[in-house]
Amino acid sequence: MVRNEFTFPSADGRTGIHAVEWTPDMAPRAVLVLSHGVSEHILRYEPLAAYLTEWGFAVAGHDHLGHGLSVAAGAPRLYFGPRGSWDWAVQDLYARRELAGQRFPGLPVFLLGHSMGSFLARTYLIRYPGTVAGAILMGTGQMPPALVAAGRVLAAREARKVGDRHSSPLVNKLAFEAYNQKFAPNRTGYDWLSASTENVDQYLADPLCGGDPTIGLFREMLRGIACIEKQENLKRMNRKYDTERFYESV
């Protein structure tokens, strides 16, 4: 396996997006584009990439806006941008897919999104139908519309108090605290992330992981969730059998 790192311009017009490509030692038979979760970065997925390259898959990914090494000078971590910046993150994902397609012409391209990355992937599937051969959504979710609306109101209120470039202890508590309660007694504040204590410890030791997302990021993510849960948008996503092609090829 060979790892290659490079940057490409974000749709925000100011950030250089840190991108990674893992290429198998053999001729690749398909490409998988990864969309990572909140408060992490794409190199956390290198063990997965190593496994997939052994089976002949090329793997591509990038650090989302405000994550990992995709943070513009003077910008806070875990911040996409001003109102509407969810669209920038989705456009960056499309740009990464296009770069992967140019790098490996003629090969089927699949998309895998995890957690927040799954919400970005679902928005991608709505905005750019037919541009991937299939998609895998891990750690995704479905929120009642009333809860999404309440979250957006709360995020707007907190943003008015301290600004959207800052985090809110209240918003972060409501968003994440219940996850860890299901794994009490807790060893760390992130036990819910993985059944592997080694994986949790690696996350805690990684300076590019963790931290509280900004209010602006929560606002944008809730905006994205509201979009992907509309019935008319759900109907625009790829059908299940397209994704089954990926499992069959593995």
Describe the function of each predicted region.
Residues 1-26:
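N-terminal cap/lid segment of alpha/beta-hydrolase-fold proteins
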Residues 32, 36-40, 115:
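Active-site glycine-rich loops that stabilize anionic/oxyanionic intermediates
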Residues 47-75:
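Conserved alpha/beta-hydrolase
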Residues 81-102:
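Alpha/beta-hydrolase active-site loop
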Residues 103-115:
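Alpha/beta-hydrolase fold nucleophile elbow
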Residues 113-123:
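Glycine-rich nucleophile elbow surrounding the catalytic serine of serine-hydrolase chemistry
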Residues 121-208:
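Alpha/beta-hydrolase-fold enzymes
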Residues 216-250:
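Conserved serine/cysteine hydrolase catalytic core
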